């Protein structure tokens, strides 16, 4: 059963400018593994913008309650390329309250825009 659906878009250039203006913003929005590639290189702005859009979409799928921490949701990618969500703390508590048992995530970025769709399934 679908419990919630969220969608969000982020303008990549604008998101990158926000990260440049406020260097500590990346540490508030992302956990360490989201910021770097497996090789140790820093992840590109388009990829980070898509991950941010996924977190916004996740909040919407959960009914957009206040009090969710960005660091309590992690977007990671399987070897196959399939994006996944790992939730903890405030996000996991809200998901449990709603009866969420799994997530479906889709990320994309093209033409200067990053987008994400998150489906919460119970």
Swiss-Prot record:
Nucleotide-binding is among the record's keywords: no
Keyword hit for Protease: no
Q: Name one Pfam family in it.
A: ACPS
Indicate which residues the UniProt annotation says bind Mg(2+): 8, 56
* Listed cofactors: Mg(2+)
One GO BP annotation here? fatty acid biosynthetic process
Quote the EC number.
2.7.8.7
Query: GO MF terms on file?
Result: holo-[acyl-carrier-protein] synthase activity; magnesium ion binding
Q: Which reaction does it catalyse?
A: apo-[ACP] + CoA = holo-[ACP] + adenosine 3',5'-bisphosphate + H(+)
- Looking at the record's lineage, which domain of life comes first? Bacteria
Q: What class of enzyme is it?
A: transferase
Q: Which InterPro entries match?
A: 4-PPantetheinyl_Trfase_dom, 4-PPantetheinyl_Trfase_dom_sf, ACPS, Ppantetheine-prot_Trfase_dom
Please give the GO cellular component terms listed in this UniProt entry.
cytoplasm
Annotated localization: Cytoplasm
Keywords per UniProt: Cytoplasm, Fatty acid biosynthesis, Fatty acid metabolism, Lipid biosynthesis, Lipid metabolism, Magnesium, Metal-binding, Transferase
Q: Which family, according to the similarity comment?
A: Belongs to the P-Pant transferase superfamily. AcpS family.
Function (record text)? Transfers the 4'-phosphopantetheine moiety from coenzyme A to a Ser of acyl-carrier-protein.
Q: What is this protein called?
A: Holo-[acyl-carrier-protein] synthase
Species of provenance:
Streptomyces griseus subsp. griseus (strain JCM 4626 / CBS 651.72 / NBRC 13350 / KCC S-0626 / ISP 5235)
């Amino acid at each position: 059963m679908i419990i919630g659906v969220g969608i969000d878009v982020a303008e990549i250039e604008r998101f990158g400018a926000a990260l440049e203006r406020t260097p500590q913003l990346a540490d508030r929005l992302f956990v360490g593994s989201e910021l770097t590639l497996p090789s140790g290189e820093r992840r590109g702005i388009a990829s980070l913008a898509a991950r941010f859009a996924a977190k916004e979409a996740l909040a919407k799928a959960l009914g957009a309650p206040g009090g969710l921490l960005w660091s309590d949701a992690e977007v990671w990618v399987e070897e196959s390329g399939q994006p996944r969500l790992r939730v903890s703390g405030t996000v996991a508590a809200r998901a449990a309250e709603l009866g969420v048992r799994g997530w479906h995530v889709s990320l994309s970025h093209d033409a200067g825009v990053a987008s994400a769709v998150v489906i919460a399934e119970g």
